[in-house]
From Swiss-Prot:
Keyword Ribonucleoprotein among record annotations: yes
Gene transcribed to yield this protein: rpmJ
Keyword Transferase part of the UniProt annotation: no
Biological processes, Gene Ontology terms: translation
InterPro entries: Ribosomal_bL36, Ribosomal_bL36_sp
The protein's name: Large ribosomal subunit protein bL36
GO terms of molecular function: structural constituent of ribosome
Length: 37
């Protein structure tokens, strides 16, 4: 899990999901997991 100021989808499997005012990137590639805030 990377915590970043700006989250971007890295590959075509990355999905941006908003949960409780936190932006997350969920992907089947474990390296691409990110969250913001």
């Amino acid at each position: 899990m990377k915590v970043r100021a700006s989250v971007k989808p890295i590959c075509k499997d990355c999905k941006i999901i908003k949960r409780h005012r936190i932006l997350r990137v969920i992907c089947k590639t474990k390296k691409h997991k990110q969250r913001q805030g």
